[in-house]
């Protein structure tokens, strides 16, 4: 097979994989820039005068800024607690060969998240925690905590044990060695895990739909405000969806090298 043919197959496959999601992304943005009449016209209008009225209405009529702040608070809390709990757990699995704990974490990742929904709802309803940041943060931890722990195991396994032994000979405790020796060496993994946890929490819909309320509604759930009986505000949905996806997409674009480095370096061992 010639080099030219390989390049054609490679780039052709890349275009085939990227074209569908890119088309949906562009269509979503165009929907938010059209009026309601233009969005339901047939055939679709591809040449039109864009308007920002839908984005203005999202903030003025639907209190969207509050929902953005709720998502930011919950995603930040879920990410922070995932790191605080997941890093020691991953270190224990990697250094003490806790295979059973690793299997439990893997099982948590494999279990459908919807299976946790009813027990959590009953517990939070009994404790009067529905529509609170506490309930949503705890449920988001079901997604983010196992992911952080599972990603970090490979990073901790790649740290040479001799470095920790040398630090402990110099008088460091196990905890101090973990904090000042090990964690700086796996900073790429920590950054990658934090970014992935934040994105997963930001995009979470099901738990937020059931457990949130007027005070803690997140942006994925807020899109429901544009759907009512007998009417769907496609322009509003397009504008709201763009506001949800665009910040995370821009953030992921700028940190893409960190994510790639983190996911690949964790697979390498000395």
Residue ranges and their predicted role:
Residues 1-270:
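A hydrophobic, multi-pass inner-membrane permease signature
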